[in-house]
Amino acid sequence: MIHKEFRFTLIKVFPLVHALFLAFCVFLLNYQVAGPMIQGDEGGYLANAAAIAGFHNDLASSYHAGYSFLIAPAFYIFDTPQSIWLTVKVINSALYLLLVVALWWIVKRLFISISFQKQFSAVTLVSLYPMWVIMAGYSFPQIAFATFFLLTFIVFVKAFSLKNISWFFVGLITGFLYWIHPIGIVPIIAGSIAVSYLGFIHRRYSLPLFFMVSALGILILYRYGINPWLTERMTISGLKADLHYQNALRQFRFFYDYEGLISLLGHIGGHVFYITTGTLGLVWLGLLSLLQQSLNVSRNPTGLEVHEWRAISLFLGLSFLGIEAISILMFSGPLTGQRLDHWMYGRYVEGVLAPILLIGILGSRLKNLIWIIPIMVAAATLLAFTLKSYTHTAPFNISAFFQYFFLENLGVWAWLAAGCVVIVVAAFLKAPFGWAFIIVIFWLSIFFQQKYHISSSYAVERSRWVIGQFIRQNFPRGTCVGFDYISADNYNRKVYWHDLGFLLFDYKLKRLTYEQWLKSCEGPFFTFDREIGSRAAGKIYPISRNPIEGILWIRYSDFKDVSGFIDLAGDPTCFVNGCFEMSYIELASFSKVGRVTDNGLKSTGASGYLFFGPYRRVEAGDYYVEIKLEVSAAGKANFDVVSERGGKKHIDVQISDYFQAGQNVIRVPFSLDKQVTDIEVRLYISKDSALTIYSYALKINDGGVNAPGLSKSPID
């Protein structure tokens, strides 16, 4: 008796323990993510949250604020970007926890005859679908959308047995999906159709009325209440909000001609191909199971009436198909110049996948996956004959596309072959081995997605956070900071605006022209306009810069406050042109074969690049690289300065041509005939090279350094 009671208690509390364990693991997986990297998406939601918490800013946008309300407590509680970002990841992990708990509720309610072991396996499998695991490390709203869609589904099912008024509350939570993201309009429409069907069947015509009044009411509240209130808090410069969502009707302009129709077909193929291979066909098993339940031919009794299953099928099926259609229309466009993930975008529709996947796993047999292959082949064929080229890929938008990390360069047919293989293996492995195999494939995607995310976030921190960190270190909170938004004339430059928006959430960061800044802003001014210095000679001074683009200026009258941070001996011309210095500590991040010692970067007896990078922007002109080093044996040490990822060489010499015994500083001159955006200073050494690098600096050559340039200056 005691044993049975203990087992009953264990089974009752196990779902919560299971959810807590998985949520903790997800938090640990994302712990090393240094910060937001996808701007302005992540930055837009963070800026909303800061404004909600009382930090008025100038970053109003089209991004909806439902998710931002959830992460706003991070800005209430903490006062540094690092601690806020950590708290955002904690909140995301809590949302993931709710997602797993919701999956358990659905299993217990809809599949009461399934064994506990199968319930556990199914919940674990769906919980490890890559999208919600990796989204817990971003400040994208999809982790919130997926969780609240599950909660919406739960109250939808619970309302079957409650009074008519309960549908009012179903409408409220469904409407909140629109607060999280504009695609939330689709579940509202799908819910209205499903509830109307129930009302018709039961002759309870007030059901859809209750649902629609509350859903539309909360939608209108956001559109005409929350949105204007938030916009007022986020336009402190007086300029209009920077809106980016396209008018949906404009998308149809692409379908007026032959190329537009071909693009549409290709994007249909790409989207269907991704969602099929990404879920290993489980999404189609889910839709098939919904159809079977609706026709009362399912093998699994669930305790629900057929008409209730039909309402569920309408809600889930229309939500899935509607969002997929919107995604296809949004990204269909020119046949060239698009990213790969735009051809097969998954992040939107994956927000409604969880209940469909769960129903597919428990409502059908894995062997049925074999019938999914023709769908994938047809979709891949459409994609293959349309996709001629693409620019690059944002892998987090196709989080379950494991082929990206192994077979990207091999093309669609290789992706198709790999997808078919894993689906066939999953179909012919009996449970639980088939389920375990699917989990392994999901984890493979998660592992490589996390590897990409962590390394990319640290690269962003090194390359784009310099200005924001400098301002926080040298100017008090609340200081006005001007940003020359007009000079941010492309996407790559606009990301810095959102970077600063997060890093300076408690400053008065404003979109200002140079003239407006002089009149109304007491703090520094950031611009990409390199001509500012010559136009304002004698008035302003450069004090910091982004490693790649953009310079931070102050007035001469403020110079005394930050004089200790002037770069390169206070040479403003060199500073503005892009001169820089790299210490051996910094070079360690750009070394293949070096080892950091107490005072330098030392060769290790291996051949390879002792240093490379750092991919900086440098203006056209005459320069030289001054290297401080100690040479025991030069060997075959080749020094060059390149750009375009090594495609263009500006100087290529042997260190031995410039070095003489007893010297510890060499200077190598070179010229740039035009601006470069990714300059690399490289030293490739052989196995017999024995040397230590202390630092190097890129400086303007006013004619005093010629080839070969030797110096006997001591290391200082």
Language-model regions, residue ranges each:
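Extracytoplasmic catalytic/substrate-binding loops of multi-pass membrane glycan-assembly enzymes
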Residues: 32-46, 58-74, 82, 459-463
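Membrane-interface alpha helices of multi-pass inner-membrane proteins
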Residues: 122-123, 166-181, 191-193, 213-219
